[in-house]
A protein has these predicted regions:
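Flexible, glycine-/basic-rich loop-and-beta segments that form/coincide
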Residues: 1-51
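C-terminal target-recognition/interaction regions appended to catalytic cores
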Residues: 30-188
Length: 188
């Protein structure tokens, strides 16, 4: 791309991006009472657990036996024509997706002390995971909010890019890494 004389391009030196977040989901999950109707009933929870592969089932067994409560996210996938659930092994969320076009919403799995509870992730949790936890969700239906934050660009990523690239570029203070190549005559 940079060597194509038909494209006007430039490069700029950027600092090393922050280290990826590898934990903290439990800090962002809403504290929802065990009696809240958003938690799935026993039949739906059983269907979830029954759909797990042996690897997933073992993961859930280990988490269930552990002391204290842990949170994980889960996705519904189709494997060999059958809908199954996959639970993340770590304390982070998977990619937030919109619930359209074949993608699915994430479920929150609360597990530990021999208990398992499952529910859909809330719009507030989607917002928190995207760095917009204080965003006013008033007036938006839950599915609108999920759609708005699913497949979006996370606020911290945009802030870093703005501070380290866009604002210096606008101010003309970004150092050039390579010469800007002139546009070739387009014949227009």
């Amino acid at each position: 791309v940079y060597g194509d004389p038909n494209l006007r391009t430039h490069r700029a030196p950027l600092p090393t991006p922050p280290i990826p977040v590898t934990s903290g989901l439990g800090n962002l999950v809403e504290d929802i009472a065990s009696s809240d109707g958003r938690w799935w009933d026993s039949a739906r929870t059983k269907a979830f657990l029954d759909s797990l592969s042996p690897t997933q089932r073992e993961r859930m067994t280990q988490l269930r036996r552990g002391s204290g409560v842990k949170y994980r996210t889960a996705y519904r996938r189709t494997r060999h024509g059958v809908a199954v659930w996959e639970v993340r092994p770590d304390d982070v969320s998977g990619c937030l997706r919109t619930a359209r076009g074949g993608s699915s919403k994430q479920a929150v799995v609360k597990v530990g002390n021999q208990r398992v509870q499952i529910r859909w992730m809330t719009p507030r949790e989607y917002a928190r995971l995207m760095g917009a936890g204080d965003y006013n969700l008033g007036g938006a239906r839950p599915n609108q909010a999920l759609f708005g934050f699913g497949d979006a660009v996370a606020v911290p990523a945009v802030e870093w890019l703005a501070a380290n690239y866009l604002i210096p570029l606008i101010k003309g203070t970004i150092p050039q890494m390579a010469e800007t190549l002139p546009l070739a005559a387009s014949g227009v």
